[in-house]
C-alpha cells in the first residue's frame, strides 16, 4: 500500500545525546515507526495462549484411579457373593429333594425305576456341586455316625431279600468313623417282635487319595440282644373277626412280662460276641464324591452308590 512508506518516512523529533545540557535525560520518542513496532514484537514480546485439551470426563476425575479400582472390586465382590449364595441355596434345595425322594424306598430296596432314575440324577447334580473337593483332608466332617438312607447295592440286605420282614427287620444301618484312630464301624441293627440286636464289623482305613480310602475289615461283633422289657397288654384282641377279652388272663401275661424283664436284664449284662474275619474278601475301597456337615455320598466297588445322612441332621426328618 502507498501509505505505509509515508509513515516510515515521518520525521521523529528526539533529543541529541551529545547536547550541552547534560542534566536532561533522554526520553523515548513520542512516535515510533511502524517497522520498529513490528521488530519489537518479533524480538521482545511473546503472547502465550493457554492450551486447552478436551477429554471425556469419567469417574476417574472424581475418585481417581484407586477409587475406580475399589468400585469395580466392590462390584466384583458383590457379584461373587451373590453367586455363592445362589449356589448354596441350590445345593440345599437339591439335598432336600433327594431326602424327599428317598422317603419310603426302604434304603433303595423298594423303589420304582422312575424314582431310582430321579434319585440318580439328584445324586449326580449334588456330586457336581461338592463343597468339599478333598474330603480326606477334612476328616472333621467325616467323623461321627452316618445313617444309611439309600444304596444301589441290594446285596447289602440278604435278610430283607429273603422276605422275612414280618419276623425280623433291619431297623438301622450305620457307619461310624473315627479319624483319630482311623477306624470304621459298619453296623446293622435288627428289630424283632420282642428284641433288638446288632451285627457290626470293625475295620481300619488308609487314605489313598484326597477322595479315596482303602478299608480292611478285621473283626465282627454280634451285639447282645436287647429284649423288650415293657409289653403293653391290651384289654382285648381281634382274631379272624372275633373279639377276645384278655382281662381273665391279664394276670398271667403280667407274670410273663415280669419274667421277660428279668431275662432282658440278665442278657443285657452279657458282653457282645466278637470274632475275627477271614482274610479273604475283607478289603474294599470307598470313594467320597460329596461331603458336608449333613450329607455324604460315596461310591464303592462295582459302581455301587451310598447316600448317608449325619445322625441328628434335619434331613432324617421327612
UniProtKB/Swiss-Prot annotation:
Domain of life: Eukaryota
Induction: Up-regulated by abscisic acid.
GO CC terms of this entry: chloroplast; chloroplast stroma; chloroplast thylakoid; chloroplast thylakoid membrane; cytosol; nucleus; plastid; plastoglobule
InterPro entries, sorted: PAP, PAP/fibrillin_dom
Signal peptide: none
Keywords noted in UniProt: Chloroplast, Phosphoprotein, Plastid, Thylakoid, Transit peptide
Modified residues (Phosphothreonine): 57
Transit peptide segment: 1-55
Tissues expressing this chain: Expressed in flower buds. Detected in tapetal cells, endothecium and connective in anthers and in subepidermal cells in filaments.
Compartment(s): Plastid, Chloroplast, Plastoglobule; Plastid, Chloroplast thylakoid
BP GO terms, sorted: photoinhibition; response to abscisic acid; response to cold
Pfam families the record matches: PAP_fibrillin
Family: Belongs to the PAP/fibrillin family.
Quaternary context: Interacts (via N-terminus) with ABI2.
General remark: Simultaneous down-regulation of PAP1, PAP2 and PAP3 leads to impaired long-term acclimation to environmental constraint, namely photooxidative stress imposed by high light combined with cold.
Function: Probably involved in light/cold stress-related jasmonate (JA) biosynthesis. Contributes to the protection of photosystem II (PSII) against light stress.
Protein name (record): Probable plastid-lipid-associated protein 1, chloroplastic
Source organism (scientific name): Arabidopsis thaliana (Mouse-ear cress)
Lineage: Eukaryota, Viridiplantae, Streptophyta, Embryophyta, Tracheophyta
Gene: PAP1
